[in-house]
Amino acid sequence: GMFGGDVHLRAYADLQRAGLSPNLGRCGLDQWTRDLAGIEFDLVAVATRSEASAQKSAANFKEWTGHEPKAYHGETPWEDVLRDFPDLDVMAVSTPDHLHTPVVLAALENGTHVITEKPMCLNMTEDDLIIEAANAKGLVVGVDMHKRYDPDHMRIRDDVTNKIGDPVYGLAVLEEPLEVSTSTFKWVEDSDPFSYVGPHWTDLFWHYYHSKPAALTAVGQKKRLVRDGIDAYDAVQVRVDYANGMSVHYHNNWILPADFEGPVNQGHEITGTDGKVESDQQYRGF
C-alpha cells in the first residue's frame, strides 16, 4: 500500500544500501556510506495480505538495492515472519489502522522492537496492552510522527512559541481527497479521519508545549460516503482542552473533491497572549 510500499519500503532501501552513518545517527545518502556505517541493516522479509503484493514489494526492493527479502502473505503473515526469524530486531507495521495492535503485540511477545504507523492503535485498552508489553520486556514501540520535523514546525517549537506568549487556542486542519476513502483504502469503515491523520497534529502540539489533555469532545458526520454505500465518517472535529489552559480544535476529513487545488489541505495556527503564528503546509507558507 501507500505507506508500506512507498514510505516504509523506500526508507528501508536507503538503509539497506547505506546503513546508518556513524556519529550522525541518520540514514546514509550514497552507496559508499555503508562501508563506514556504524550499523548495518538487512530487510529480511516483507509481509502482506495478498501474494501478488508481497511478491511486488520484494521485487521492488531487489530492484532498488540488489537484495531480495523473503515474501510472506496471508491473513496473519507476521506470525510466519516471527517463526522463521525468531531473532528479528525490529518489526515495521504499516497495516490498516485497525490491524496495528495484533502485529505490535506479537512482535513484543517475541522480544522484537516495533516501528508502527500512526495511530499506534484505536482505543485505550489496546494502548494499555501495548505499553504494558513494551515496558515488561524493555522494548521500544516507535510511532511515525514526521510532522514534528518539518522545518517550519521546528522553528515554531524552538523560536516562535517563546515570542507569542502563553497559548490561548489553536486550530489544526488536515483534509484528504475523496479518493482516499473511496478507492485507496478499503478499510475506512474500521477507522475515521481523525484517527487516521489527527495524531500528526496532536503529537505536534504535544511537541510544542508538553501539556497533557484535561478534557476532550468530538463530533463526526456521515453524509457523503454513505451515498457510495460506505458506512464511515466523512469528517471528525475534535476539541482538546489542555492542562496549560490552551484549547485546540482538530479538523479532519477524507472527502475533498478531485478538483481541489492541492493533494491535501493542511495547516495549523496558534493564538497566544502576545502574538499569533500561522503555518500552511499546503503552500509551505509561514
What are these regions (language model features)?
Residues 120-125, 129, 149-151:
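Conserved PLP phosphate-binding loop immediately N-terminal to the Schiff-base lysine helix
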Residues 140-142, 147-230, 238, 258:
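Predominantly a Rossmann-like dinucleotide-binding segment in NAD(P)-dependent oxidoreductases
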Residues 230-233, 241-286:
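NAD(P)-dinucleotide binding in Rossmann-like oxidoreductases
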Residues 110-112, 137-139, 245-247:
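A short helix->loop->beta-strand "cap" motif at the edges of active sites that frequently abuts
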Residues 92-93, 116, 172:
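Redox-cofactor binding/interface segments in oxidoreductases and associated redox assembly factors
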Residues 110-123:
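ADP-ribose/adenylate-binding Rossmann-like module
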Residues 1-110, 128, 132-137:
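N-terminal glycine-/serine-/threonine-rich beta1-alpha1-beta2 phosphate-ribose binding loop
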